[in-house]
Amino acid sequence: MTAAGAVMRAGALLVAAALLAPLAAPAGTTSPLPPLSAFPRERIAVETRSARRHVFEAWRADTPDTRAQGLMFVKSLRPEQAMIFVYEPAQHVGMWMKNTLIPLDMLFVDDGGCVAKVHERARPGDLCTVESGVPVVLVVELAGGT
């Protein structure tokens, strides 16, 4: 199963990813890293148990360099924006908040499409590792509290 085609379920959530044409990204960085506008874009749909659907425009981080950069130095993230980290094949993943300026929620998605873990409101700049706990193919980062 490819990460882009995964359907993610975890009690209250159903998440589907669909590839979109690259879109311009308004969030900038204050570092020599490539701007987020250089990242490919995808649309992420999150559906609650009560069938409420939330759509996010997500930057795709699917290389070692883009996964290492993530949302570093991004000063704001609108509620409808996200970043997805793609891992193929599925693997144990550890995320941290180094050089991340905003709080984030993280969804860890296994290769069966299930959200295996949710970590809410990761603290900006925190160097503690947030572990997936199981092999995952995606990590979805959303604005903290989303």
Per-segment meaning from a language model:
Residues 1-13:
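Bacterial N-terminal signal peptides that target proteins for export
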Residues 28-146:
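Compact, glycine-rich, soluble single-domain proteins
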Residues 11-22:
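Bacterial N-terminal signal peptides
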